[in-house]
Structures are given as structure tokens and as C-alpha cells.
A protein has these predicted regions:
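Conserved Rossmann-like nucleotide-cofactor binding loop
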Residues: 63, 86, 323
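Glycine-rich FAD pyrophosphate-binding loop
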Residues: 72-96
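Extreme N-terminal leader/targeting segments of oxidoreductases
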Residues: 2-55, 73-74, 521-562
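Active-site/ligand-binding neighborhood in enzyme catalytic cores
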Residues: 50-51, 177-303, 307, 312
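N-terminal Rossmann-like FAD-binding beta1-loop-alpha1 element of flavoenzymes
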Residues: 50-80
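Dinucleotide-binding Rossmann-like beta1-alpha1 core, especially the glycine-rich loop
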Residues: 98-194
């Protein structure tokens, strides 16, 4: 110990100290060769590292980086394993020999993404556009024009969403049929009871039961599901639908959106990963997890296996999408031991196809962000003017468009040229100027089974943040959480929740601060409280009636016996 104490002080370089040489190497006055002192220092560093608890995170993107971000700041020895050589799932760049870098999917960042915006402030970066107006198209033209809600006088929920957007083809009488939907949104409080109550029913059935008009469903509600839950209403869980609606429409401004001014992987993930690396986290690429080894005494995960490599772990976080986790489960004898992981094999994911087009001229597009429906019964899509959204395309001589297609299984087998032809035809039906513009370059990227499908009945197969292995935790946008957020914000929050579970399990470090979803407006809280009281009274009444019937039958039986 005294040697390590000496090595913490600056060593003098005078001839009195370096007065002897041995084999051409300097030897200090204490009798230690300089290289020996360096060895002591290295051993001391290794000893300190060995004392740190080891956490292995599998998967990057918002959940994996979120967990790594906090745990590395708490001094844990964190290793993040990536199956590929690029991080960020659907939001990193793709290189194509015929075109500049192309991004897979253009994610929006909604007003209630408070935890993500807090992270951006912490990183000291400015990756976002200003708040952006949007439009929704059908083959008949513009169906909805959405303003920036926070710029308008605030109305009680849901009045702002009903009256501020422009609905050229949707009469007020149809819009008003959505009001009964508020009762279901209020009844859905994101508890386990609420999810199980609504999950088996399709969104289409729910809207029909509540009296929503067919035109409202066709022109507004179903298009929202196609780009929000990536599937048509008859294939969406009504519980997931209510969860999404209650998050994005709880307050007038919640649907406002900004976009990244470039590839998310470059603008956000790259500086974020550099920050995490500075905290000591290791990023290892091209490491596909094949199995786990268990501690024979505790039954906990002892090592993460990647082919011939093994990584010791005091705790493990799986921050993966459904398809990636299913692949691991299919290979892992350890995960196959648990029913909860076998249940994951019942879940499904949705295909995405993204198309980026470089046009030979400028096309005037009223809104930079646009969603579309009605061109295909089961497929939703969105298109974006990247010359307005992305910095790198501002000086392009022609317009650069990205079109992202969800539930795009019908596009997967088609050749690129066929897909591009269809996309160009769809765009021309939205905006006439696309018809005369020529495509000078293109990138088509297919992502089969890449986003979560919240189908009716899926809730019972989904995992919670904690698992049957006491040191194995989950994160991702499909993991059950009571936070109430959605999409990227939910993915990031579950990463922080996983980090907090690791800290709680290992008994070290400070918990991550997670910003709660903003409280409901007072009238919504009052209605929700009233609904709970009515449900409680209904339950008590049913219990009283059943008790009365039981004692009546018992009394009658006693009389017969006598």
C-alpha cells in the first residue's frame, strides 16, 4: 500500500533521484525501476476496475443508450453489445453507392418528450427544427391541416384537437361523434386492469361501440393509427390505442412536433455515445448474443455469451426490439427455461419500407411533414420535405423527399423500381407538381419486422422491466411501464427505469431522475375520479347482491333440511 501511496506523488527527475541505471533503464532512489513503478500503477488501475460491478447492456437505440448513459455516470463497469456496426435501430444512416447518406425513418419528437429534451440540454446540442405544422392526405387531397397548437389560445382537452385543425372534408357533425371517445380515454388509466380490460378488443370495435362515425374513422382515426401504431384499426389493440391517444392528446400542445435536422444517429446518438464513452462505457460492435450462463448457486445470469466470447456480468439489461429478442430466445437454452420469454415468441412486429428520392426540380410542398392514408387499405405512410428539415439538403438544386411506409409487407418483395414508381404515383395524387418532376436518384431500404405490433391480445405476452432472473432487466418501447409515455420517449424512459433497477439490485449508485408525464387537466382528473367512484359503487353493489343471494339460498336450504 505504501508503494501505491508514493506513486500518487510527482516523481522528481533530478540526477539525485535518477542516479543509477540498470541495463540502460532508469532506477529511482527507492530502488524501483521506472518501468516497475508503471507496472504498479497499471496494476492499481486494474485493481480498481476489478472492484467495479459489471453491467452488460445488449442493444443500443434509445433504451440501451439511456441505460448506459446513467449507469456509466454511476461508476459501473458498463459494456454495451451491438449486433451490428451501427447504433440506433431505425435512425442511423445507411450508405448507398448511388446516393448520399440515407436515414431509415424520420421520427418526430412530440411536445411531451420531456426526458429526451432534458437529455438534449444535458448534452449541450441543438439537433432539432422549430415546431412544425403538418398535413394529412388521402387520394382526394388534403384531409387535415394541423397547426402549432401552443401558438393558439389554450382550450380544455379535447376542444383544441377538435376545432383548431382544418378538416376540409370532415363536417363538424362527424367530428363531434368523437366526443364519446373521451369517456374511454378517461377510463383508461394505464394500469394493468385497464390494459387487460381493453386489450382484447380492436380499435375499430371500440370506435364503433362509442358511436364514432364511419367518415371520422376513415378520414381521421384510422390514418392516425396507421402512422402511430403502424397498423389499421382492425389490427390494433384498443388498449394501445387509448394509451397513445391519452399521451399525445392529454393537453392541447402535446401533439406539436419537431424533427431532427439530419440523421438522428449523427446529430444525437454520435455525441451522446461520445459522452457515454468518456464515462468509461465500452461499445462493442458485431456482437450477437447467443445465450447466457447461469450461476449454479443463485440462478442469476453470470455471463453473456456471444459465440466464442463471454462477458462476465453482475447485472444485464436487454434493450431490444421484439424481433431481435425473439432471435436470442430461439437460440438461448437459458431464456427458454422461463415461460415469460417463451411468451414473447407470440408477439409480432411490423414491416417498414423507406424510400428517399432526389428530384430534378423544386416541388412546392405546403408542409414539411405529411401523413397519408387511403392509397392502400392496410398501409399507412408519411412523406417529408428534407430540403426543409435536414441541413445537408438545404442547397440541393431539386427537392429531396423521404417516404416511410408502415405495415409495408406488400412492398417487401417488389423491386426498387416498382416501389419508386408507386411512391411517385402516390405523391402526385397528393401534390400535382410531383407528376412532372423526374427522379434523378433513389434509395429504397426494407426493414422486415422492425417495429412493434400492438395487436389485440398482445399485452399478456409482453415483458415487464423486471424478469424471473433477479439480475436481468428489460427496456424498450414495447416493455410494460406505468410511466405513460410512448414511442421514443417510452423507449428512453424504460432505459432509465432499467438503470434504476440495476442500481436497486446492486445496491450502489444514485437513481436516475425520470420526469413524470404531465398531470391531466383538472376536468379530466375530476371525471376520472368520478368514473372510479362509480365503478367502485358498481362493484360494491354487485358484491352486496351476490352476498344477499348467497344467504337467501342458504336460508332456504336450512328450512328444507329442517
Amino acid at each position: 500500500m505504501w508503494v501505491s501511496g508514493v506513486s500518487n506523488y510527482p516523481l522528481p527527475c533530478s540526477s539525485n533521484f535518477l542516479r543509477r541505471f540498470n541495463g540502460g533503464r532508469e532506477v529511482g532512489a527507492l530502488g524501483f525501476r521506472a518501468d516497475t513503478l508503471e507496472t504498479y500503477r497499471a496494476n492499481e488501475v486494474e485493481s480498481e476496475a476489478a472492484k467495479k460491478k459489471k453491467v452488460v447492456i445488449v442493444g443500443s437505440g434509445w433504451p440501451g443508450l439511456g441505460a448506459a448513459h446513467h449507469l456509466s455516470k454511476q461508476g459501473f463497469d458498463v459494456t454495451l453489445l451491438q449486433a451490428t456496426s451501427c447504433s440506433g435501430s431505425l435512425v442511423t444512416g445507411q450508405k448507398n453507392a448511388a446516393a448520399p447518406s440515407s436515414e431509415i425513418g424520420i421520427p418526430g419528437f412530440r411536445c411531451p418528450y420531456h426526458n429526451i429534451f432534458c437529455l438534449i440540454d444535458e448534452l449541450g446540442i441543438q439537433p432539432f427544427t422549430k415546431w412544425t405544422k403538418s398535413a394529412q392526405y388521402s387520394p382526394e387531397g388534403v384531409e387535415v391541416e394541423t397547426p402549432i397548437f401552443q401558438d393558439l389560445p389554450r382550450l380544455p382537452t379535447p376542444l383544441g384537437a377538435l376545432f383548431y385543425p382544418l378538416f376540409p372534408h370532415l363536417p363538424s357533425v362527424d367530428r363531434l361523434t368523437s366526443v364519446p371517445l373521451l369517456s374511454a380515454v378517461i377510463d383508461f388509466d394505464n394500469t394493468d386492469v385497464a390494459w387487460r380490460k381493453y386489450d382484447m378488443m380492436t380499435a375499430r370495435e371500440l370506435f364503433k361501440q362509442l358511436g364514432c362515425s364511419e367518415r371520422l374513422y376513415r378520414n381521421a382515426l384510422n390514418p392516425l393509427l396507421l402512422v402511430g401504431l403502424f397498423a389499421p384499426g382492425e389490427q390494433c389493440s384498443s388498449a394501445a390505442t387509448l394509451g397513445m391517444l391519452s399521451y399525445f392528446f392529454a393537453h392541447q400542445q402535446d401533439f406539436d412536433v419537431v424533427y431532427c435536422r439530419g440523421v438522428v444517429g449523427e446529430k444525437i446518438f454520435k455525441p451522446w455515445m461520445e459522452s457515454i464513452k468518456m464515462n468509461g462505457c465500452r461499445f462493442l460492435e458485431n456482437r450477437k448474443v447467443t445465450d447466457f450462463l447461469l450461476d449454479g448457486t443463485t440462478g442469476n445470469i453470470l455471463e453473456v455469451v456471444c459465440g466464442n466470447e463471454k462477458f462476465l456480468a453482475d447485472s444485464v439489461v436487454l434493450a431490444l426490439g421484439i424481433s431481435d429478442l425473439q432471435q436470442i430466445i430461439m437460440n438461448s437454452s437459458v431464456l427458454q427455461m422461463r415461460e415469460e420469454f417463451l411468451n414473447v415468441l407470440n408477439l409480432r412486429a411490423i414491416d417498414v419500407v423507406t424510400v428517399r428520392l432526389w428530384l430534378d426540380r423544386k416541388v412546392k410542398i405546403p408542409k414539411a411533414s405529411n401523413t397519408c392514408s387511403g392509397f392502400n387499405d392496410s398501409m399507412g405512410w408519411a412523406f417529408f420535405d428534407l430540403t426543409l428539415l435536414h441541413d445537408e439538403y438545404k442547397d440541393e438544386p431539386g427537392t429531396v423527399i423521404e417516404a416511410d411506409f408502415y405495415h409495408a409487407n406488400q412492398f417487401l418483395p417488389l423491386k426498387d423500381e416498382v416501389i419508386v414508381g408507386k411512391v411517385k404515383s402516390y405523391l402526385a395524387r397528393c401534390i400535382n407538381e410531383f407528376e412532372v418532376a423526374a427522379v434523378v436518384d433513389q434509395v429504397v431500404v426494407r426493414f422486415p419486422k422492425s417495429v412493434t405490433h400492438f395487436f389485440p391480445g398482445s399485452y399478456k405476452y409482453m415483458l415487464r422491466g423486471s424478469t424471473g432472473f433477479s439480475n436481468l432487466f428489460m427496456a424498450g418501447d414495447w416493455i410494460i411501464t406505468r410511466h405513460g409515455s410512448w414511442s421514443q420517449e417510452k423507449a428512453y424512459v424504460t432505459g432509465l427505469e432499467a438503470a434504476n433497477r440495476v442500481i436497486d439490485y446492486l445496491g450502489e449508485g444514485k437513481f436516475a431522475r425520470i420526469i413524470a408525464v404531465e398531470e391531466d387537466e383538472p376536468h379530466v382528473q375530476a371525471l376520472r375520479s368520478l368514473g372510479r367512484n362509480i365503478n367502485d359503487l358498481r362493484t360494491q353493489s354487485q358484491s352486496t347482491i351476490l352476498t344477499f343471494i348467497f344467504f337467501e339460498e342458504k336460508s332456504v336450504s336450512s328450512v328444507h333440511i329442517q
